[in-house]
Regions:
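Glycine-rich, aromatic-bearing surface loops/beta-hairpins
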Residues: 161, 166, 170-234
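Short, surface-exposed beta-strand/loop "edge" segments at domain boundaries and coil↔beta transitions
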Residues: 19-24, 64-68, 210-213
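N-terminal ordered "arm"
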Residues: 2-52
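Extracytoplasmic/secretory-pathway segments with low complexity and glycosylation-like composition
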Residues: 112-164
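Structured domain cores in non-transmembrane regions
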Residues: 37-117
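Conserved NAD+-utilizing ADP-ribose enzyme module
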Residues: 128-130, 149, 153-154, 199, ...
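Ordered hydrophobic segments in well-structured contexts
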Residues: 9-15, 27-31, 55-60, 195-206
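Non-Sec secretion/translocation targeting segments of pathogen effectors
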Residues: 182, 237-269
Length: 269
């Protein structure tokens, strides 16, 4: 996965099959997501769609949000890619890593709809962050225990963190047993036995319950995602100067009315 975490969406290069078959290459980069109602006007304004040339294709991607190139090809539908981009902007921090872990260790994905189903059910994936005491304690080089440990060690620390019997045994006497215990090997055994898949910041419970890749149709995912995305955009949209001026004027008028009313009431007392 590229360095960009793609929570701001991603860029695709859109071309037109009709012009391409006529020997003319027309394609333009487009940033997703965009409001669905603005897609066709955008395509027309960039000369990519007209009455005789309506079918578009994706000629390139500026990086892929996940390591599953088989679902990102020239036949990807722009409306579906747009919904996927919306899904990414709505994800909580950390969910991108969980989804990638599920892609790496779960069932192979063949279609964009399956990926969107995975994203839609991100909170149901059997993927868990490493979590143990002192994981964020820094050493003299300002690296945390999480950063300097292997995934195998981080998994062992996580699984054993709340095992009081284990730690009582390891810390018995002067704690020599603790220095002899191989946490890295503990994690390796779990991997070799097929129990887990290990990543940099999280692990996959291979025996856990996995969400279905065809749980929701594109229409279901699209309808809910677009509504949520539009709501988020409306909340984040800054007020226009005219709206601010109108609100200030209304507030001033209200304050003046309250002041006059207050004076009148005071005179009656």
């Amino acid at each position: 996965m590229a360095n960009n975490d793609f929570r701001d969406g991603f860029d695709v290069c859109v071309g037109n099959w009709g012009y391409y078959s006529e020997g003319e290459l027309r394609d333009t980069w487009m940033h997703l997501p965009i409001d669905p109602d603005k897609i066709e006007p955008w395509l027309r304004s960039h000369g990519l769609v007209d009455a005789e040339h309506e079918e578009t294709y994706i000629s390139d991607y500026d990086g892929l949000p996940f390591r599953c190139p088989q679902v990102f090809d020239e036949y990807g539908r722009l409306d579906k890619l747009n919904v996927l981009a919306m899904q990414l902007t709505l994800l909580p921090e950390g969910d991108l890593a969980h989804i990638q872990a599920a892609i790496d260790y779960g069932e192979p994905l063949d279609h964009l709809d399956e990926l969107m189903n995975l994203v839609a059910q991100a909170d149901e994936l059997p993927v868990f962050d490493y979590l143990y005491d002192d994981m964020y304690v820094e050493d003299q080089w300002h690296k945390t225990c999480l950063e300097r440990s292997t995934p195998q060690e981080n998994y062992a620390y996580t699984v054993l963190n709340d095992d009081s019997e284990f730690w009582n045994l390891m810390n018995r006497g002067d704690g020599e047993l603790l220095s002899c215990f191989d946490f890295n090997r503990y994690g390796e055994i779990a991997v070799n036995n097929g129990y887990v898949g290990l990543c940099e910041t999280c692990y996959v419970n291979k025996g856990g319950d996995w969400p279905l890749l065809d749980e929701y149709s594109f229409e279901e995912i699209g309808g809910e995602t677009v509504a949520e995305w539009r709501g988020r955009v409306a909340q984040e949209k800054p007020a226009a100067p005219s709206e601010i001026a109108y609100a200030a004027s209304a507030l001033a008028a209200l304050s003046a009315d309250d002041g006059a009313g207050g004076t009148a009431r005071a005179a009656k007392l």
